[in-house]
Amino acid sequence: MSGVSAGTVDRVLHNRGDVSVSSREKVQKVLDEIDYHPNMFAIGLAAKKHYHIVCIIPYYIEHEYWYAVAAGIDRAAQELRPFNVGVSYLYYRHADKSSYKEACAVLREENADAVLVAPNFREETIKLTAYLEEADIPYAFIDFNIEQTHALCYIGQDSKTSGYIAAKILMRSYEKGQELVLFLNNQKNNPAEIQMQRRLEGFMQYLSEEHKDLIIHDIVLHKEDTDGNRRMLDAFFKEHPQAVLGAVFNSRVYQVANYLHEKGQKLAGLVGYDLLHKNTEFLKTGEVTFLIGQRPGLQGYCGVKTLCNHVVFKRPVTAVKYMPIDILMKENIDFYFEFE
């Protein structure tokens, strides 16, 4: 078609050897006409280089949030093994700054071609990303985005929009005279708290638009103080019997649900986040009305695949990949799965 030899076409395709300008133009014209694109998977299979992707995530236990993230990462790793891509983990304790710093320090000793980070502790993450950028190592974030960095991609949920939706579905249960209670977190200065604040912003935006006169209370729950939480909730519900709508902005809606279960009572509506086993059990029994899912397994899977597309297959990637905002209730939870 181009009127040149097969050897010339091969040299143009693989950008090697000397080719005259006129011959190169002839070959390129035909390539454009047939919309030629190189088979990057074949190139990856043929490549002799081995690639190493390091994933920094919190320690986890079975059936919890980060367990699902790791399952997605493992699935991507299995699919990419034929392309000489290896995936390894560095773990840290979720609320422990020194543990996170240690994982970041160990990374510097790894021969990483790309890094997937579940960021925690903003300053330490910024120091980590400064090192990665200086070393020209691409990195992506999952679960939480730190905008001051130059991450290749963020994969996770739009927290503010999810909060807006949480309010919208919860208020479907509203009847005149009812009051709302927000169950908040006592942890400060970590990404989980910032993520909760963004959800709360979206939640309050909907209420300001549609329910300006709603009476709203808030209670701060403590992760490790079950007895203190129980006394606080006893006093609150005794004083505010009309507070029959509730919202939890982290994954621990089971704390409130367990209290309600022990008391043999249910709210008119209670919304929370994440499909932890404890949360879904209370969804099925009715103490929790709605759960917002953020597909942690898909986050891990897409994080590794995105880095591989960039590093191995040289494909362009989008800077932000938002996860679907899944709304689960007892009627559909048994039919839910992230991906197959």
Model-derived regions: residue spans:
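Hinge/cleft segment of the Venus flytrap/periplasmic-binding protein
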Residues: 30, 34, 191, 207, ...
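N-terminal helix-turn-helix DNA-binding module of bacterial transcription factors
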Residues: 1-47
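Flexible loop/hinge segments that line or gate small-molecule binding clefts
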Residues: 124-161, 276-284
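Amphipathic helical "hinge" segments at domain boundaries
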Residues: 39-98
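Hinge/beta->alpha junction and helix N-cap segments in small-molecule ligand-binding domains
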Residues: 58-67, 88-98, 121, 156-162, ...
